[in-house]
Each structure stands twice: as structure tokens, then as C-alpha cells.
Amino acid sequence: MRGTTMNKIDWNNLEYYDFIGFVGVAAFLIYALYFGTLWYVTYDYRIEMKDQMVEMYQQISDPIPPIKDDYGVKKRWLIYYIVGTREFERDLTSDEFDRYGKQLLSRGWKIDKKYTEIDRSRKSTTMLLSKGEFIFEITWWEDKKICRFHLIKEDWIYDKGF
């Protein structure tokens, strides 16, 4: 450029706002480099994990045969998880829901927690199960023909909080 002279940075007499600017730019570059590298390095692992979770979800049995099985693979930062809804021909009874928990126990799942909530005059029962690194949550509402499922894998990426 014509008429412009470039001055060297005087490191001995650096002003406060110039210093803050350098620190801010350096912090942003380190942040971008860290997460960009993490995303790139874990890409194949995350795709493999997603496929493994879909396979695990499809292998989970049903309390009674469903009319419709609607699920989707969701992503939050670097973690994939599955959210699904299965619709049945009729309402499930609490005995059928308990038998379903026992059926999952025989397939290697472990019931970590089971609780019932009443919210806005609707009663729901939730079972939280685990099998290895997988966490599976089932919610059933009384007088509704659906169950909601959540499946997530607790691995090293999940433990990091991503």
C-alpha cells in the first residue's frame, strides 16, 4: 500500500488494550485448535459409535408389538444419543411394564433406578437401565399408548462433558 508505513511493535511499552487483544486472539486460536483437533481425531470413532448405538437400539425388545417405532439419532457437541417413541395398539398396564423390565434384565441390562412421577395429573413411570457403557431410559405414561426411550453411551468423550 502506498503511503503507509508499518511500525514495529514496541514490546517494552505495550499498552494495556493491545496486550488484552493479543491475549484474546491467542486464547481464541488455542480454543479453535483444541476443538478442531478433537473433532477431527474423533470423527471415525464417533461415526462408529453412532452405528453401534443404532444397532443396540434396534436389538432392544418391546413389551408388546409396536404399531410404530419412531427414533432419531441426535447430536450434542461430540456425543450422539438416540431418542425414540414406540406406539402400541393399546395402553400398557403396570404389570406389563414391570415384566418388560424383567425381560430386559434377562438380556443383560441392570435396573439402576425406577421411579413414578405425577405431573399435571398424568402419572408416568421411568426405568433407568445400564449395560456396559450404555444407559437406557424408558418412560411410560399411564393411559397413553406410547413409551419414550433414550439411549446414550457413556464413553471417554461423554465423561469429558462434550
Model-found features: residue ranges?
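An acidic-aromatic pocket/loop used at catalytic or ligand-binding sites
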Residues: 7-162
